[in-house]
């Protein structure tokens, strides 16, 4: 069964042109990432049918929703999709339950995978069903908006910076629920964001946009580890590793294992065997040619240099490393690179000074 998403759009405006040609996975979270004005929201609106591209094609598996070459265009209200915007836009005269029931009325396909009580439980809003929207926090309103979208039985969920209007506390409140959706839903999610932390935590696939064009598209780490794109991530350059809790040690440390080896973090509460996603910034990795020695840095792994490239920061370079098949980035000074004679193929040790757990 074909589940791939095909999206080709050209949208011309007086001061901006969107011109994209994408093939995206039919499952998991695809993040559309870029700076303000890069075309992320325009691309998402074109996918939804809210922005009709003069030259456009959009297919979800074998279902073609738009093909301008044949004059074919299914309007947004007839598409089996859910859309969540920055603002929740709940109906103020309806309770949480009433807003969710509105989603049921919008179904364009047969059955909803989850019932209203199941969705409410999944998103942690079961205790809020009788409340009016004005008695909800920003994070709670967004969860209700997501629930309403899911009850319409969508075949794809489009999310336009759903956390942008929330403060840090509310963002941290809602992120675990988005992760739960990721694991529970069989439908693809297209997620627009300009926040690297959100992308690193949630995405499986990453599309990098700039000035209306696709700069890069691929599996998350494949794009994150590209050293020809340092300007896109700047100080946030780094990689994501998928690790597993291996052991809780007696000195309040937890050992995580990943294909490239093991890393230690402060003691975690998750049981052994639990998968954890971690982020390692390039700025938190230093390099040494010396063998493993006494050091306060616990996490030190053997690596080989793949390539290096200059960064936007004068006097610095970005080094791509291979750690038993896993990519790792290090940002060091040009002077250090010259002193250590950093070059492709060089074997060395990478010292990881900090690991950010994305959970």
Swiss-Prot record:
Domain called ABC transporter: residue spans: 1-236
Subcellular location: Cell inner membrane
Membrane topology, record value: Peripheral membrane protein
Coiled-coil annotated residue ranges, if any: none
InterPro entries the record matches: AAA+_ATPase, ABC_transporter-like_ATP-bd, ABC_transporter-like_CS, Mo/tungstate-bd_C_term_dom, ModC_ABC_ATP-bd, Molybdenum_import_ModC, Mop_domain, P-loop_NTPase
Record-linked PROSITE patterns: ABC_TRANSPORTER_1 (PS00211), ABC_TRANSPORTER_2 (PS50893), MODC (PS51241), MOP (PS51866)
Keyword vocabulary terms for this entry: ATP-binding, Cell inner membrane, Cell membrane, Membrane, Molybdenum, Nucleotide-binding, Translocase, Transport
Catalytic activity: molybdate(out) + ATP + H2O = molybdate(in) + ADP + phosphate + H(+)
EC number of this enzyme: 7.3.2.5
CC terms in the record's Gene Ontology section: plasma membrane
List of residues binding ATP: 34-41
Location of the Mop domain: 294-359
Record GO terms (molecular function): ABC-type molybdate transporter activity; ATP binding; ATP hydrolysis activity
Keyword flag Cytoplasm: no
Quaternary structure, from the entry: The complex is composed of two ATP-binding proteins (ModC), two transmembrane proteins (ModB) and a solute-binding protein (ModA).
Role according to the record: Part of the ABC transporter complex ModABC involved in molybdenum import. Responsible for energy coupling to the transport system.
NCBIfam families the UniProt entry points to: modC_ABC
Similarity comment: family membership: Belongs to the ABC transporter superfamily. Molybdate importer (TC 3.A.1.8) family.
Protein name: Molybdenum import ATP-binding protein ModC
Organism of origin: Dechloromonas aromatica (strain RCB)
Gene this protein is translated from: modC
């Amino acid at each position: 069964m074909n589940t791939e998403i095909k999206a080709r759009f050209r949208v011309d405006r007086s001061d901006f042109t969107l011109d994209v040609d994408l093939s995206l996975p039919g499952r998991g979270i695809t993040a559309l990432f870029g700076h303000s004005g890069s075309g992320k929201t325009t691309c998402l609106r074109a996918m939804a049918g809210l922005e009709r591209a003069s030259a456009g094609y959009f297919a979800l598996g074998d279902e073609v929703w738009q093909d301008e070459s044949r004059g074919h265009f299914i309007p947004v209200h007839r598409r089996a999709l859910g859309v969540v915007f920055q603002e929740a836009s709940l109906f103020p005269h309806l309770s949480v339950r009433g807003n969710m029931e509105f989603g049921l009325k919008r179904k364009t396909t047969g059955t909803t995978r989850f019932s209203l009580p199941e969705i409410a439980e999944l998103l942690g809003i079961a205790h809020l069903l009788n409340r009016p929207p004005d008695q909800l926090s920003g994070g709670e309103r967004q969860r209700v908006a997501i629930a309403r979208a899911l009850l319409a039985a969508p075949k794809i969920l489009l999310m336009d910076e759903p956390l942008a209007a929330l403060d840090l506390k509310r963002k941290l409140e809602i992120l675990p629920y988005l992760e739960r959706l990721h694991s529970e839903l069989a439908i693809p999610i297209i997620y627009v964001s300009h926040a690297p932390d959100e992308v690193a935590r949630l995405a499986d696939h990453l599309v990098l946009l700039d000035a209306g064009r696709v700069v890069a598209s691929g599996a998350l780490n494949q794009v994150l580890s590209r050293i020809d794109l340092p300007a896109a991530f700047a100080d946030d350059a780094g990689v994501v590793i998928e690790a597993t809790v291996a052991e809780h040690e007696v000195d309040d440390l937890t050992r995580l294992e990943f294909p490239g080896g093991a890393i230690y973090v402060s003691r975690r509460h998750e049981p052994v065997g639990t998968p954890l996603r971690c982020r390692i910034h390039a700025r938190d990795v230093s390099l040494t040619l010396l063998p493993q020695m006494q050091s306060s840095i616990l996490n030190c792994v053997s690596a080989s240099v793949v390539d290096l490239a200059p960064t936007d920061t004068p006097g610095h370079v970005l080094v791509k490393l291979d750690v038993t098949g896993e990519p790792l980035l290090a940002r060091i000074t040009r002077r250090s690179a010259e002193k250590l004679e950093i070059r492709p193929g060089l074997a060395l040790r990478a010292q990881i000074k900090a690991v950010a757990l994305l959970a």
